[in-house]
């Protein structure tokens, strides 16, 4: 599947947030000032219209989860078909992606690294290898690292890094065994308050 291969730090500066979790892996404040717009001197950000604000929020969320436009729109369509709040449904669908779950469990230092692990067949779901990053993990599914991949130093480093993050309450992880259980679908209160999904719903509702 196609994915963005351009300069990621530039995108983070545009959105004003660490989209790709680089700051958790290495210090980036000297190389990339997130509060400044892209450019040598951080060009002044223009004042956005309502549409511009909605578009920026959509782009931010899309890039956080590493999803291209067409796939993101499909997630939104699926969210509208589900019962409940469309915006919250969208976020839970994104959170249920296998690459995101692998990251949340601490097996990958970033979502991009977790996605690579999935595509390289290092991850199993319920004892079977799954190499599709967008695979939707269901409640009670067991996600684990394949035995032959457990010795990879990057996984051990990622688990150490995960100890510094708040542990998701909807997951149960056994770091020693390198496996975890997707206990339940996360609720909105479990997820980042920095995301305004209502803006995305407003954008797609036009």
Swiss-Prot record:
Pfam families: Ribosomal_S4 (PF00163), S4 (PF01479). PROSITE patterns: RIBOSOMAL_S4, S4. GO terms for cellular component: small ribosomal subunit. InterPro entries: Ribosomal_uS4, Ribosomal_uS4_bac-type, Ribosomal_uS4_CS, Ribosomal_uS4_N, S4_RNA-bd, S4_RNA-bd_sf. Keywords: Ribonucleoprotein, Ribosomal protein, RNA-binding, rRNA-binding. Coiled coil: none annotated. Residues 96-156 form the S4 RNA-binding domain. One of its GO terms (molecular function) is rRNA binding. GO terms for biological process: ribosomal small subunit biogenesis; translation. NCBIfam families: PRK05327.1, rpsD_bact. Part of the 30S ribosomal subunit. Contacts protein S5. The interaction surface between S4 and S5 is involved in control of translational fidelity. Belongs to the universal ribosomal protein uS4 family. One of the primary rRNA binding proteins, it binds directly to 16S rRNA where it nucleates assembly of the body of the 30S subunit. With S5 and S12 plays an important role in translational accuracy. This is Small ribosomal subunit protein uS4. It comes from Proteus mirabilis (strain HI4320). The lineage of its organism: Bacteria, Pseudomonadati, Pseudomonadota, Gammaproteobacteria, Enterobacterales. The gene is rpsD.
């Amino acid at each position: 599947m196609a994915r963005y291969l351009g300069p990621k730090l530039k995108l983070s500066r545009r959105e004003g947030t660490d989209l790709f979790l680089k700051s958790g892996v290495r210090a980036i404040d000297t190389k990339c000032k997130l509060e400044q717009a892209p450019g040598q001197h951080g060009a002044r950000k223009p004042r956005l219209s309502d549409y511009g604000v909605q578009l920026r929020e959509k782009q931010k969320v899309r890039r956080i989860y590493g999803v291209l436009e067409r796939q993101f729109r499909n997630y939104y369509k699926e969210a509208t078909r589900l019962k409940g709040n469309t915006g919250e449904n969208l976020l839970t669908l994104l959170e249920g992606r296998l690459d995101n779950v692998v990251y949340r469990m601490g097996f990958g230092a970033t979502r991009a690294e977790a996605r690579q692990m999935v595509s390289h067949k290092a991850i199993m779901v319920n004892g079977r290898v799954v190499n599709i990053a967008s695979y939707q993990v269901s409640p009670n599914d067991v996600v684990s690292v394949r035995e032959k991949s457990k010795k990879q130093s990057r996984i051990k480093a990622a688990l150490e890094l995960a100890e510094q993050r708040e542990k998701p309450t909807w997951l149960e992880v056994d770091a020693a065994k390198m496996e975890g259980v997707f206990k339940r679908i996360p609720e909105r209160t479990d997820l980042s308050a920095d995301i305004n999904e209502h803006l995305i719903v407003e954008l797609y509702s036009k």
